[in-house]
Amino acid sequence: MSSHLVEPPPPLHNNNNNCEENEQSLPPPAGLNSSWVELPMNSSNGNDNGNGKNGGLEHVPSSSSIHNGDMEKILLDAQHESGQSSSRGSSHCDSPSPQEDGQIMFDVEMHTSRDHSSQSEEEVVEGEKEVEALKKSADWVSDWSSRPENIPPKEFHFRHPKRSVSLSMRKSGAMKKGGIFSAEFLKVFIPSLFLSHVLALGLGIYIGKRLSTPSASTY
């Protein structure tokens, strides 16, 4: 005899229990922990209206609004904010401190003031030179205009030059008073005549002696 084994069907309550256990053991979806929640269209609209009326809950964008362009706007806003923050950081890094900026401005002002002072001194010196030159030219013109003119005299008087007085016995005081035979004339004339004769006699004797000595030595 052949026997046929027939397996009994599994109990239904066990399947239901297994389904419940599987549902309980499944982890919650990752979307619930994030800030974005996907909700059905109708339920999301209803919740949005309710939240708008109450005014106390935050607006949670739906998947349709994200796909319709909200995500692009959010990305653009984030990009702009990141660009602004980076530009601020670079500007803070590149821009000098207020003390350095003040020092640079002070140095620039000192340099410009020195340049202006040197230029002003040069201009003052040049101005003084020009004023002195103008004064000299004005003085020369005034001197030339105020000088006396060379006016010739009205009458010409011709005068002969004075002759030099020659020394002579005739114009002496003795000759004028008594002539040749006056006592004053004789007092001057006789001594001078005697002295002249004595000098002539002495000179003749001296010359004769000098001439006689070489002739005697030759013999």
UniProtKB/Swiss-Prot annotation:
Mod. after translation: Undergoes progressive proteolysis to an 11 kDa C-terminal fragment, which is blocked by the proteasome inhibitor lactacystin.
Keyword Nucleus belongs to the record: yes
Regions crossing the membrane: 188-208
Protein family per UniProt: Belongs to the NIP3 family.
Phosphoserine, modified sites: S62, S117, S118, S120, S166
Compartments where found: Nucleus envelope; Endoplasmic reticulum; Mitochondrion outer membrane; Membrane
Name this protein carries in UniProt: BCL2/adenovirus E1B 19 kDa protein-interacting protein 3-like
GO biological process, one term: mitochondrial outer membrane permeabilization
Membrane topology per record: Single-pass membrane protein
Keywords: Apoptosis, Endoplasmic reticulum, Host-virus interaction, Membrane, Mitochondrion, Mitochondrion outer membrane, Nucleus, Phosphoprotein, Transmembrane, Transmembrane helix
InterPro entries for the chain: BNIP3 (IPR010548)
Motif BH3, chain ranges: 126-148
ATP-binding recorded as keyword: no
Top-level taxon of the source organism: Eukaryota
GO CC annotations on file: endoplasmic reticulum; membrane; mitochondrial outer membrane; mitochondrion; nuclear envelope; nuclear speck; nucleus
Subunit structure comment from the entry: Self-associates. Interacts with BNIP3 and STEAP3. Interacts (via BH3 domain) with SPATA18 (via coiled-coil domains). Interacts with PPTC7; this interaction promotes BNIP3L degradation. (Microbial infection) Interacts with human adenovirus-2 E1B 19 kDa protein.
Organism: Homo sapiens
Principal location listed in the UniProt entry: nucleus
Residue ranges with Low complexity bias: 42-51, 82-97
Name of the encoding gene: BNIP3L
